[in-house]
From Swiss-Prot:
InterPro entries: Ntn_hydrolases_N (IPR029055), Proteasome_alpha (IPR050115), Proteasome_alpha-type (IPR023332), Proteasome_asu_bac (IPR022296), Proteasome_sua/b (IPR001353)
Function: Component of the proteasome core, a large protease complex with broad specificity involved in protein degradation.
Protein name stated in the entry: Proteasome subunit alpha
Location in the cell: Cytoplasm
GO molecular function, one term: threonine-type endopeptidase activity
Length: 241
């Protein structure tokens, strides 16, 4: 049977869409999400002070993303509406990261299957529990695939190098400053060389940092900026040789 000109099998279409999405995501700077003694820490390489990769979603839930900003921003705002509606109609305790992750998985899966162009995004939805054992971190990819991660995850460009560093240095129950240093060192390991082909140095001005702190009252999400971020970085800065 002769195939019409320009025909591509379903398998080829899936491969092409996947390659397209992965290339777009790989161009984005990485984001790390990891647990620390009092909650969950979000760290992104992001020099912009207005275009956030990390956001608060609900009482105990945070969001991080890489890829095309307008696409993951659309998902973020839609997620907030979903959770606000669910909390209003039922109970705030019914709003969970798992429910949000499932909604995102359905949306991304439908877009990947039905649209010519998939979303070029990778997302993390995290929820801080009342204890460390209750913390939840979900990773979602462009095709709607969802994974339940434990301890840490990295998304975006060079994520494999970043994950290798996290596996070596992250441990459960680390203090906030130590977890931040682990995240920054991991992002540095995944960053391309600097102008002189040397190791890049990530400073507070290159970072977007936030946390979900289970010890806080009411709003558990807090951005770490300014002198607080500088102090945490200085606390674990490598000694000059």
């Amino acid at each position: 049977m002769t195939m019409p000109f320009g025909y591509a099998s379903p398998e080829q279409q899936v491969r092409d869409k996947s390659e397209y999405a992965r290339k777009g995501i790989a161009r984005g700077r990485s984001v790390v999400v990891l647990t620390y003694v009092d909650g969950i820490l979000f760290v992104a390489e992001n020099p912009s002070t207005t275009l956030h990769k990390i956001s608060e979603m609900y009482d105990r839930i945070g969001f991080a993303a890489v890829g095309k900003y307008n696409e993951f921003e659309n998902l973020r705002t839609a997620g907030i509406r979903i959770m606000d509606t669910r909390g209003y109609m039922y109970d705030r305790r019914d709003v969970t990261s798992r429910a949000l992750a499932n909604a995102y998985a359905q949306t991304l899966g439908a877009i990947f299957t039905e649209s010519i162009k998939p979303y070029e995004v990778e997302i993390v939805v995290a929820e801080v529990g009342h204890t460390a054992a209750d913390d939840q971190i979900f990773r979602l990819t462009y095709d709607g695939s969802i994974a339940d991660e434990r301890g840490f995850i990295a998304i975006g460009g060079q994520s494999e190098q970043v994950l290798t560093s996290l596996r070596e240095h992250h441990t459960e129950g680390q203090p906030l400053a130590t977890a931040l240093r682990v995240a920054v060192d991991a992002l540095t390991a995944g960053a391309p060389p600097g102008a002189q082909n040397g190791e890049r140095t990530l400073t507070a001005g290159n970072l977007e940092v936030a946390m979900l702190d289970r010890k806080r009252s009411r709003r558990l999400f807090k951005r770490i900026v300014g002198s607080q971020l500088d102090g945490l970085l200085e606390e674990t800065a490598p000694s000059a040789s």
